[in-house]
């Protein structure tokens, strides 16, 4: 225990409009009081109203559990494979499998552009059925056909009993499956006419103007090659042909087709024309794609949410949703360059002026605005803002990295609603707690509670390879000149293990969060090892006093005082300690590196 420890408790507050769970710190401070707490991240203060999730049908309800038996555990571990057995569409993207080597938590990461495609109802001669074709072709051997698409050399194979039960479940409750089964029956009749399935791309005229349409409106049969009633937004899946149809990120059937185990009832996803319950003041009438997914991905007590609570499949779905939102934004920029005043960036003369003398580089250039996170202009604008601060105040004095700790009590308490769930299953909760802690840490720095009075602060947020967020922060102190001093470094930075007899809490925290390695001969496979040596130059040398090398880099005090800890049964002393601020470490209890800098 530590009296100044940062702690917010569990997410014990709810939005008064949609019942999404929150921490008190996440309130809209300008509109809230202790008696009237306002949240608007989830539903924009009641303006976005969407249907609730329905309970999953059996046996899916019993299988999707984090605290279930052996069948449930095996299903949750292979849930992405099970979903791929029943998906109607292919996920055209490179999935980075190298990230999951080792013993760390599972992470779903993709590279490149996401494409969703659907083929014909009947496979080409000599080809095995796949995706939607499995609902039509050779259904007498359907289970074996589905199992044939699984890599036989994988770590584990889906259970045929579970696959059979899921086939029956989808046949009973999923309207999209029923449409494909109807097409199968038509195609198998002796006098079968040409049959196609229309995936409806526009939905309107559905009862409640605030509710999504019923899933029966997502698909229809076209008999005899008729194209009556087919709009430019619809996708027609023909019975034969080698052409693949791309499905738009805003097609209402997209997610139901790609994730039948998340949406077993075939519920429609985002589509254009979803109205606000209460129109906002900005003049818009329709819910945006981002607002739709933000609403759906908030947990509400007593309401099942497969989009958050399906383990590895939820990870894939959330990445898919984000990529869809990004694709829609990029599409808007592509077709609205005139609104962004981009005419000066187009044309051969402009290309030559920018040095694009190669003919392959000459053509139409599309500009991303500075408001688009990650764009070239976004990065340049923030870089020049920081350089402007440096021109006024000189180089920063302190550099600190604030890293998320997935074992924070707030995260653990947020997982209590789904017993057995782990932090790696809920990236949303991890990031929300991290931002609360980061806001508090930045406030501590700005108010002078960490490094004394400061003149300026700048920071950037990033994500580690495994997905945990962290923030790099640079600080300009008020009480220092342009040259750092030994006294200032020793006042705010320590690179030693505290004495366990005098400060047992400090010793325990440094031991847990601030010890590098072990690496070197004791662990040559450590991630920091490059060309046979540690890229971070550990272990450091013992030093009785802090000093600076000729280039101005600090050489922290690391006394040979006999204080040692063990990590992986390897003794580590002060030479392995990562520089830190002990008071900050005690308050936030995470990996928080602090360095002195002067250039």
Q: What are the roles of these predicted feature ranges?
A:
Residues 1-599:
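Non-catalytic interaction regions
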